[in-house]
A protein has these predicted regions:
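Buried hydrophobic residues that stabilize the cores of well-folded domains
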Residues: 22-327
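Bacterial Sec-dependent N-terminal signal peptides
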Residues: 1-26
Length: 327
C-alpha cells in the first residue's frame, strides 16, 4: 500500500508538465499568471494584517501560503487528476516566493519559501520555448530533475522524472492525427503498477478524461462547454470515493465570474467562488462551515495587483505584498 501511495503521488507530480502536451502551453507564463506588461520578476511576501490610520499595514511575517503545504499538495493533486477548480489554481500560488522571467515571458527560476527548507527550481527551454528541463534544489542539493523530450512536431513525447532515489519515473505521450493528446502512460523501471490516462475529444475540446490502473478505471473527468468554447460544467469522480460537480458562469466579455462546486452532490459540502479581472479570486465561501473569505486588491500602474488583504468572516487577516519588477 505504501508503494502504491508513492506511485500515485509521482503520477500527479508530473501532471502539471503533462498539461503542456494538452495544448495548455499556448501563451507564456505572463499570461498564465495574469500578468500585464513585460514582467522581469515577482516577489511575494505574506504578513499578518494590522490596522493603522484607517488602513492596513504589514505586521508579523507569515511563513506559509494562504494554504499550508499539505493542503496545497492535496488540492493540487486533485486538480491534476481532473478536478477543475479555478479557486485552487489561484490560491495555491499565493505563497512566499520569488519568480524570475526571461524577456519572452517564461519562468527561468523560482524560489519557494513556504517550507522548512527553501526550494530553488530552475527551468530550461529550447529555441522554440519548449520546457526541456525542470530541476529542483534544496540547500544547493539536487532533489529532482525532470527532463522533457519532444517529437519533430513539437509535441511532448517523453518525460523522465529522476527523484535521485533508486530509479526513474517515465511518462510517454500519444497523439491523434489532429495533434490532440489521446493517451499518457506512466511507469517505473521497477516492476510496479502501470497507469494510463485516456483523453476523448469532441469538436477539438476535451470532454472525457479517464485514469486506469491495471486496466481498471479509478478516476473519471467529464467536461461540457458553451457556445464560445468556455467550460461551463465539469464532473470529476474518484471511483467508489467522491465526486465533484462544478458549474461556471461568465460575464459579457466571456471572463470567468462565478464557480459553484458541490462535493458528493450535497448542498452542504462545496464552495462558491467569485472572480474579478485576471481571474483574481474575490469571494470564497465554504458551504460545510458557512465560512466566508474575501480578497481585496491594490494595483500598480500596469494593472497588476501588488497588495491583497484577505478577510475571514469580515475580519482582516493577511497582508499579501507583490514586488513586481519590469524589463
Amino acid at each position: 500500500m505504501e508503494n502504491l501511495t508513492k506511485i500515485i503521488c509521482l503520477l500527479v507530480f508530473g501532471w502539471c508538465i503533462g498539461a503542456y502536451a494538452q495544448g495548455e502551453a499556448t501563451g507564456n507564463d505572463w499570461s498564465k499568471m495574469g500578468l500585464k506588461g513585460k514582467v522581469k520578476s515577482v516577489k511575494t511576501s505574506i504578513y499578518f494584517a494590522e490596522a493603522k490610520d484607517n488602513d492596513f499595514v504589514k505586521g508579523t511575517p507569515f511563513s506559509q501560503g494562504i494554504y499550508p503545504p499539505e493542503k496545497i499538495k492535496q488540492y493540487s493533486e486533485m486538480e491534476r487528476m481532473g478536478v477543475k477548480a479555478f479557486f485552487i489554481q489561484f490560491l495555491v500560488n499565493i505563497i512566499p516566493s520569488a519568480i524570475t522571467f526571461d524577456k519572452n515571458g517564461f519562468i527561468t527560476e523560482k524560489w519557494l519559501y513556504n517550507t522548512v527548507s527553501p526550494k530553488k527550481i530552475v527551468y530550461t527551454y529550447d529555441k522554440k520555448n519548449h520546457l526541456i528541463d525542470k530541476t529542483t534544489f534544496v540547500h544547493d542539493f539536487l532533489e529532482t530533475k525532470d527532463t522533457l523530450i519532444y517529437n519533430t512536431k513539437g509535441q511532448l513525447e517523453k518525460e523522465v522524472l529522476d527523484l535521485k532515489t533508486k530509479d526513474e519515473t517515465i511518462y510517454t505521450y500519444t497523439y491523434n492525427i489532429d495533434g490532440e493528446l489521446i493517451q499518457r502512460n506512466f511507469k517505473k523501471v521497477e516492476d510496479l503498477p502501470l497507469f494510463k490516462e485516456i483523453y476523448i475529444y469532441n469538436n477539438k475540446r476535451l470532454v472525457n478524461k479517464e485514469l486506469y490502473q491495471f486496466d481498471q478505471l479509478i478516476w473519471r473527468g467529464l467536461y461540457e462547454y458553451g457556445a464560445e468554447g468556455e467550460l461551463i460544467k465539469a464532473i470529476s469522480q474518484k471511483i467508489d470515493d467522491f465526486i465533484w460537480h462544478s458549474k461556471y458562469t461568465y460575464d459579457q466579455n466571456n471572463q470567468l465570474k462565478e464557480e459553484y462546486l458541490l462535493i458528493n452532490e450535497s448542498e452542504k459540502n462545496g464552495f462558491l467562488n467569485r472572480f474579478g479581472s485576471d481571474r483574481r479570486l474575490t469571494y470564497h465561501l465554504t458551504f460545510s462551515t458557512n465560512y466566508l473569505c474575501e480578497y481585496k486588491y491594490t494595483d500598480d500602474k500596469q494593472g497588476n495587483w501588488v497588495k491583497m488583504i484577505t478577510y475571514e468572516q469580515g475580519v482582516p487577516i493577511l497582508y499579501v505584498e507583490r514586488k513586481i519588477e519590469y524589463f
